[in-house]
């Protein structure tokens, strides 16, 4: 290319040769038949591998009379064709180039009755001025043609919209039946502790089988096969005393050209959101499982089977307290979950989807990438996962820990009651059999009041343990409620109102 220096080319010292040089510069700077020529012209580096950083303007080769805006549109037009050819492997890139060049030729031909190359070297200054004036519109039209081809390739051939939806459904837990089925099938495996050195204790092969089972029994089985193939499981590096719950994550694997939009950075943010939502879902699932163990029919059965007396009355009190604590925990988890799912995820998605639909005809790849980044920014910030909400996030984690401690306490309590009930029932059968055989009297440990089946020390220990968990949970809730109004960068007013109404009554 002939480089044009704006310092030496002023309106006063221009001559006919300069005009010829200028139009020839336009000819060479804009006319290209492939991305290889773009690279040779110096506008794109030959080592470009990234859409954002791989395409740059070589100012030394840009004609001085080309504005920055027009030059940038030229760059994006060429970059779009290069992306179509190299990343999308779309054979239509040649047709797009020829269509653009045809528009150029038609315009240049309209300037002169001669051929396009003659128009470029014409001595008619009016033609040159007209060319410079109308060039931005020509380039804009060329860019629209290239952008349209890129959009068509991404959305129709590579099913970009389907992948946006899949990430919302699976990594952002929008597909409720699938997530519940996955939780049902996977929780036993994730309860296992992991050796930090060998990573033994949990099988990724088993987790993959659980994932496939959850897909089969849910509506996820109706998804396109390319979506199912992209869904996988990942185990992060475990730390000391961690279980499968701490290292498990769903993963969505994509390849070029989709990785231009779903970069490592963006997929990391999806993973971050999944980790939080998975913990929230686990807490909800845990509390629902506890309700099954604690429901009134279980308590009444214990009474029918003879765990009466002072021990029985003390257990009744503890069972009632367990119900109250579980109800408080469930109220908080449900409110937070409602906020995240219906006040954060759904509105953010609806806004993003609306922009995809309404601006589809005008969006270039940069607009799609920016729209997706804004969508994830909204999710991360409003879901209280941003850098400004780190203290609040730690407070929520302490609440999640309290839920798991309560689960451990409650299951131990009810297992002990179940064991005592079984022993009591077995003793009652033996007593009945001896009475039928006219063998009167009872052995030690067969008291009909049940005091010998569960000791007072056990009941006292259970009470103290529940006291500690309840106080700890309330402390964390108080801290969370104090921190929530400080999140001025997001609107948490409705969440604060609901939680205040639940936990500040009678305070």
Which role fits each region the language model picked out?
Residues 1-507:
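Extended, charged interaction scaffolds in large complex subunits
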């Amino acid at each position: 290319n002939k480089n044009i220096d704006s310092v030496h080319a002023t309106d006063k010292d221009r001559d006919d040769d300069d005009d010829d040089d200028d139009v020839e510069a336009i000819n060479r700077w804009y006319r290209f038949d492939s991305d290889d020529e773009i690279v040779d012209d110096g506008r794109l580096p030959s080592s470009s591998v990234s859409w954002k950083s791989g395409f740059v303007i070589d100012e030394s080769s840009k004609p001085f009379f080309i504005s920055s805006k027009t030059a940038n549109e030229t760059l994006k037009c060429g970059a779009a064709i290069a992306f179509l050819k190299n990343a999308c492997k779309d054979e239509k890139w040649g047709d797009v180039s020829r269509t653009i060049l045809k528009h150029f030729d038609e315009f240049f031909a309209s300037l002169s009755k001669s051929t396009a190359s003659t128009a470029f070297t014409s001595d008619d200054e009016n033609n040159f001025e007209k060319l410079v004036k109308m060039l931005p519109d020509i380039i804009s039209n060329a860019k629209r043609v290239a952008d349209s081809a890129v959009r068509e390739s991404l959305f129709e051939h590579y099913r970009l919209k389907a992948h946006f939806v899949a990430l919302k459904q699976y990594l952002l837990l929008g597909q409720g039946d699938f997530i519940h089925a996955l939780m049902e099938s996977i929780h036993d495996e994730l309860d296992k502790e992991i050796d930090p050195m060998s990573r033994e204790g949990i099988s990724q092969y088993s987790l993959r089988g659980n994932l496939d089972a959850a897909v089969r029994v849910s509506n996820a089985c109706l998804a396109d096969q390319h979506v199912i193939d992209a869904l996988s499981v990942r185990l992060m590096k475990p730390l000391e005393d961690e279980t499968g719950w701490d290292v498990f994550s769903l993963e969505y694997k994509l390849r070029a050209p989709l990785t231009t939009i779903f970069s490592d950075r963006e997929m990391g943010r999806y993973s971050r959101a999944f980790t939080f939502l998975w913990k929230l879902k686990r807490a909800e699932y845990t509390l629902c499982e506890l309700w099954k163990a604690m429901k009134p029919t279980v308590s009444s059965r214990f009474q029918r089977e003879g765990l009466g007396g002072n021990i029985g009355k003390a257990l009744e009190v503890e069972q009632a307290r367990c119900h109250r604590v579980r109800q408080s925990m469930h109220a908080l988890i449900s409110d937070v979950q409602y906020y995240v799912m219906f006040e954060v995820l759904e509105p953010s998605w609806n806004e993003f989807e609306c922009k995809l639909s309404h601006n589809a005809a005008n969006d270039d790849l940069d607009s799609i990438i920016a729209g997706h980044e804004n969508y994830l920014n909204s999710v991360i910030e409003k879901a209280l996962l941003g850098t400004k909400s780190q203290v609040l996030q730690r407070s929520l984690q302490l609440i999640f820990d309290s839920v798991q401690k309560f689960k451990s306490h409650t299951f131990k309590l009810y297992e002990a009651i179940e064991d005592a009930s079984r022993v009591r029932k077995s003793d009652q059968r033996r007593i009945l059999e001896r009475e039928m055989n006219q063998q009167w009297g009872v052995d030690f440990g067969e008291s009909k009041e049940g005091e010998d089946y569960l000791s007072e020390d056990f009941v006292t220990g259970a009470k103290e343990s529940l006291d500690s968990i309840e106080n700890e949970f309330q402390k964390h809730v108080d801290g969370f409620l104090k921190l929530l109004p400080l999140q001025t960068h997001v609107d948490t007013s409705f969440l604060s109102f609901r939680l205040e109404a639940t936990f500040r009554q009678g305070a």
